[in-house]
């Protein structure tokens, strides 16, 4: 039985300053050279396969993912529809017999003890889990957006893992760069964090519109620090 790590959440989506910024970020000519200038209609409640434009059912999507070991499922943090899609993907992969591991952006690896307890300890209440795992300090978004995913994982024995680094590492990278990290902090990161992608920078900047008084005209040094932090996160 093949394992698949489903990583929920992509933080940059939550940085959008408004509708105009959202539209700019969704209309950038970036990515695969063969497709970056193409547009395709999106069908309500449908799954559009971008390479060929085919419409897929959820079971067909799960079948196409048979050889995939790591799957990223993005979100807008406060939009429930994104979380329903994440749950449906996890459900279909589980239904297909995959060993699904749910990777969580909101938790660092150091929180693994509480994620393991959430799955294995029936006496741990939701309130106890949120308190002991520091949900609102680590993440801050309403638990109800994510509750169905956590409950499904618990009821079906799916492992959940924290895939992020501690916030102090991200904050140091933002303020001082990678050279400001201690040896202990550096050991928590991969050998290289890619901050050189021009298209990633273009996408990141698109989320900050001119109408965003806080971020729209930020100095280059501030943008670079935020971008480094985003890449590290």
Task: Give a label for each model feature.
Residues 2-8:
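Sec-dependent signal peptide recognition
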Residues 101, 113-233:
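A substrate-binding/cap region within the structured catalytic cores of diverse enzymes
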Residues 10-18:
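Hydrophobic h-region of N-terminal signal peptides that target proteins for export
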Residues 41-44, 66-74, 128-133:
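Acidic/histidine-rich, surface-exposed loop or edge segments in extracytoplasmic proteins
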Residues 38, 55, 76-84, 140-147, ...:
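Soluble non-cytosolic domains of exported or imported proteins
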Residues 21-68:
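N- or domain-start disorder-to-order transition segments that initiate the globular core
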Residues 77-103, 109-121:
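Membrane-embedded segments
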Residues 53-95:
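Zymogen propeptides
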């Amino acid at each position: 039985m093949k394992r698949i790590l489903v990583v929920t959440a992509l933080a940059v989506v939550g940085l959008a300053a408004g509708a105009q910024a959202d539209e700019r970020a969704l209309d950038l000519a970036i990515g695969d050279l063969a497709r970056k200038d193409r547009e395709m209609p999106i069908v309500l409640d449908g799954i559009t396969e971008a390479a060929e434009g085919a419409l897929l059912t959820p079971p067909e999507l799960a079948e196409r993912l048979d050889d995939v070991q790591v799957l990223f499922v993005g979100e807008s943090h406060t939009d429930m529809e994104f979380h329903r899609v994440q749950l449906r993907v996890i459900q279909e992969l589980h239904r297909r017999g995959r060993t699904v591991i749910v990777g969580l952006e909101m938790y660092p690896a150091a929180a693994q003890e509480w994620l393991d307890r959430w799955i294995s300890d029936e006496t741990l209440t939701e309130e106890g889990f949120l308190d002991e795992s520091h949900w609102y300090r680590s993440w801050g978004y309403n638990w109800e957006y994510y509750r169905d995913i956590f409950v499904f994982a618990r009821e079906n024995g799916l492992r959940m893992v924290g895939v992020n680094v501690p916030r102090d590492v991200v904050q140091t990278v933002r303020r001082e760069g990678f050279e400001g990290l201690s040896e202990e902090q550096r050991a928590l990161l991969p050998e290289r964090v890619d901050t050189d992608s021009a298209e990633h920078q273009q996408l990141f900047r698109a989320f900050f519109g001119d109408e965003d008084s806080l971020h729209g005209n930020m100095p280059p040094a501030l943008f670079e620090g935020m971008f480094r932090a985003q890449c590290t996160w």
